[in-house]
UniProtKB/Swiss-Prot annotation:
Subcellular locations according to the entry: Cytoplasm
Disordered: annotated segments: 20-43, 104-126
Organism for this UniProt entry: Oryctolagus cuniculus
Function: Cross-linked envelope protein of keratinocytes. It is a keratinocyte protein that first appears in the cell cytosol, but ultimately becomes cross-linked to membrane proteins by transglutaminase. All that results in the formation of an insoluble envelope beneath the plasma membrane.
Similarity section: Belongs to the cornifin (SPRR) family.
Protein name: Cornifin alpha
Inducing or repressing factors: During squamous differentiation of epidermal keratinocytes. This induction is repressed by retinoids.
Predominant cellular place of this UniProt entry's protein: cytoplasm
Keyword Cytoplasm: yes
Recorded GO CC terms: cytoplasm
UniProt keyword Transcription regulation present: no
An individual GO BP term: keratinization
Length: 126
């Protein structure tokens, strides 16, 4: 019984394979033999050669080169240069120049000149 079961599946596969091979070779035996060798030879060479070279070469060069140069160069130059020049130059010139000239000039001249002349002149005559 066991030997009969083993023979059944073994004879089935070879029968199926023989039918498939005999069908395409019977009608045109010379035609399918010539294009079958030239076709699989051409597409197998340029396919794996082209996508394997330009893929890892293009994205690895422009990515780390562009963002590393313009970032640290722009914000470090215009920031400390503009606010350090116009700020301390304007408030230090007009403040100490105006209030120191007109104040001590008008108040010290008319006061000591009027009360010292009429007072000692009236008391000595009586």
């Amino acid at each position: 019984m066991s030997s009969q079961q083993q023979k059944q599946p073994c004879t089935l596969p070879p029968q199926l394979q023989q039918h498939q091979v005999k069908q395409p070779c019977q009608p045109p035996p010379q035609e399918p033999c010539v294009p079958k060798t030239k076709e699989p030879c051409q597409p197998k060479v340029p396919e794996p050669c082209q996508p394997k070279v330009p893929e890892p070469c293009q994205p690895k060069v422009p990515e780390p080169c562009q963002p590393k140069v313009p970032q640290p160069c722009q914000p470090k130059v215009p920031e400390p240069c503009q606010p350090k020049v116009p700020e301390p130059c304007q408030p230090k010139v007009p403040e100490p120049c105006q209030p120191k000239v007109p104040e001590p000039c008008q108040s010290k001249v008319p006061q000591p000149c009027q009360p010292k002349v009429p007072e000692p002149c009236q008391t000595k005559q009586k």
